[in-house]
């Protein structure tokens, strides 16, 4: 009788352990969201953007001859933007993405140290010039995607861009000391992103480097703080939160 009760108790324990193991296994399994998304050939998205930008500066030979401008330093400045995403699937690993329209509000600062500031032109020994840009852009990227792991995936991308600055001449009439920027810029971009799958959308935080290849300095010998600069190239780090479906 004792052995029979012992066997029944052991059987109950085995059943309870099996049920607990099955429950834990079922709880541990994640639901796969948007399982058919990889079958889409084309899908849309929208991106919310924060950017930090600066100018890569190359001095004009006149800078060495200047006795008034001692130092010109480019500085970082932040901005925001919105973008539409159009993605076409080429293969399980590769996609091509066009970002249009992309609207960026960007700022670039130059700090001047002057030896002989002109009070008549409201100049100071140290003065900063904020250059505002409103950029309409068209970046095109090739994306390389990893395998999907549950509701997560990593991707890398690279490509080119063209940008048109709506504010390049917005303040050209105000002061002699302005630095003018050209309207059109071309550049290259590269970055990395992460797909997080949710029941009705994909959230993709992304970071990219965006470097302009064009000299965007619109040289004007009449501008006091411009003629010591030869070339200006745009440099930007872009953080995006992308919502896709």
PLM feature spans:
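Residues that define the transmembrane beta-barrel architecture of outer-membrane proteins
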Residues: 40-42, 76-80, 132-136, 152, ...
């Amino acid at each position: 009788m004792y052995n029979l009760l012992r066997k029944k108790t052991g059987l109950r324990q085995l059943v309870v352990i099996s049920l607990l193991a099955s429950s834990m296994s079922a709880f541990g399994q994640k639901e796969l969201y948007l399982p058919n998304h990889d079958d889409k050939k084309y899908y849309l998205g929208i991106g919310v953007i924060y950017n930090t930008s600066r100018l890569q500066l190359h001095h004009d030979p006149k800078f060495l001859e200047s006795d008034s401008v001692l130092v010109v330093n480019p500085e970082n400045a932040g901005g925001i933007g919105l973008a539409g995403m159009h993605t076409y699937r080429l293969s399980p690993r590769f996609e091509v993405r066009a970002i249009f329209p992309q609207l960026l509000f960007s700022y670039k600062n130059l700090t001047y140290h002057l030896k002989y500031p002109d009070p008549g032109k409201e100049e100071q020994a140290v003065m900063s010039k904020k250059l505002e840009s409103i950029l309409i852009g068209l970046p095109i990227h090739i994306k390389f995607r990893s395998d999907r792991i549950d509701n997560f995936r990593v991707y890398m991308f690279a490509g080119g861009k063209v940008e048109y600055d709506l504010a390049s001449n917005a303040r050209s009439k105000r002061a002699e000391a302005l630095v003018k920027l050209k309207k059109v810029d071309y550049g290259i971009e590269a970055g990395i992103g992460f797909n997080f799958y949710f029941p009705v959308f994909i959230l993709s935080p992304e970071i990219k480097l965006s470097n302009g290849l064009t000299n965007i300095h619109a040289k004007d010998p009449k501008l006091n703080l411009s003629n010591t600069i030869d070339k200006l190239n745009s440099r930007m780090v872009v953080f995006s939160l992308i919502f896709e479906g």
